[in-house]
Amino acid sequence: MAHNDKPESANEAQDHSQPLDDGGFFSLNDVIMAGRHQITRSEHLLAADTRRNVRNLLASAKLLALVVIVSLAMGVAAWAFLASLNTATNYREHHAWIYALLPVVGMATAWVYKNHGLAAKRGNNLVIDSALGTRLIHMRMAVLTFVCSTLTHLTGGSAGREGAAVQIGGTIASNISSLAHLKKHDHHDLMLAGISSAFGAVFGSPLAGAFFGMEMCFIGKIDYTAGIYCLVASFTGYFTSLALGTEYEANVIASVPNMTPRTVAIVVISAIIFGLTARLFAWSVRTVKSLYGRFITNYLARALVGALVVLAAYAMLDAWKYAGLATWLSGAGFAGNTTLADAAIKLVVTALTLGAGFQGGEVTPLFGIGAALGGWIGCLVGIDPSFLAALGMLGVFCAGLNVPITTCMMAIDLFHGTAAGFFVIVAFISYLVGGHRGVYPAQRIVSPKRRSLIVDEGGTVAEAIERHNDLIE
C-alpha cells in the first residue's frame, strides 16, 4: 500500500497560526491588522499633537504681537508723560506763584475722581486686581492719572511718576486685551507685560522692568509664565521712549569697599534701617489718608485741607525744594551732601501729598529718601557715600514695593552689577524687615516672609495690616 506524504490540503501547508497563552490562535493577518491599527492611532496622535502645537504657536505669536503693540504705545506715553513732568517742573521752579494753585488742583482732582473716575481712585491696586482677574480698566484712568499727576507736579505736590506710569500701562493692556477677546491667562500675561513696559520706559531700567511685571502683584512669588512677554515689553517700551528723546538720570558709585566683616556689618545694619524707613513711609501715607477720612467727612474739604497742610509744611520747614520729584536729592546723596533731615523732610511732604489724594507715584520719592539716608550713613561711618546711597536707593525701594528680585535687576541696570554681593544682602534683608507692608495693599501674599507670618498666607497686604491692627486693639 502506497503512502501519501503530501499535506491533505494547500491551506494546511500555508497555516502559520501560533498558539496563544489562553489556548487560542492568532494569524499573521491579525498581526498585520493590529500593526496597521497602531500606526493609524499613532498618526492620529501625532496629527493632533501637531495641530495643538500650531494652535499654541499661533496663540503665542498673537499675544506677542499684542505685547509689542502695548509696549510701543506705552513707550510713546512714557515719553510724553516724562516730557510733561519736565515742563511742569521747570515752570514751577521759575514761577513760585504756581504753588498757590495746589489747593485748586487738589479739589479738582478729588471732584473728578469722585464723580467721573469710576474705580480709577484705586490706582495701582486696580491694576493688580485686573491682572489677577479679568476686569476691564476704563481708558479714562490713563487720561486722569496722566493729567492729574502732571498738575500735582506743576503746583508743587511731592510725588513720583511710577504709579501713574503703571496705571497707564495697565490701562492700555487691559483695553487691548478686551478688544482682542483674550482668555483669562492671556489677559493676565498681557497685563503683566503692560506693567513691565511702563516701568522699563519710565525709569530706563529694562531688566528691572521685566521682573517688576512678574513680581509686582505678589509677595513671595515671581510669575515666570509671563517672563518672555515681560522681557519683550520692558525692552520695547524702554527703547521706544529712548528713541523719542527721553533722558534718564544716572548716578555712579565712586568706589566699592572690600567685603570685610566690618563692611558687611555696616551694610546689614543699613539694610535694616532702609527696611524700617520703607515701613515708616507706607505707614505715614496710610495714616494721613486715614486721619483725613476720619475727621473730615466732605471729600472736597479733605482735599483743600490736605493741600493747605502740604503748603504749611513747605513753609514751616523751608522745604520748597523738596516739591515734585526732587531728583536732585539722589545726586546729593551720592555726593555725600545730605543729612538725616533731607530724608525725613522728603518722607513727610510725600506722605502728606499722597495721603491727601494727589496723584503721582512712590518710587522716585523712595529713591530720593533712600539715597539721602544712605549718603548720610556713608559719611557717618567713613564709607564712600555714593556706595551707601546706592544701597539706600535699592533697599528702601525693595522694602516699600516688596520686590527683591526686581531690586537686584535694577542694581544691574543702574550700576552694572558693581557691588553685586552687597546689593543682594541689602535687597533681601530690607525685604524681610519690610514685613507684610508696602505701598500696594492689593498685593497677594503667596509665600510669607517669615514663618511667624504664616497666618497672612493667601491674603492681601491690606488684610495683613488689618489683622495686625486688630491684634493691637
Give the location of each predicted region.
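Alpha-helical transmembrane segments and immediately membrane-proximal extracytoplasmic
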Residues: 2-473
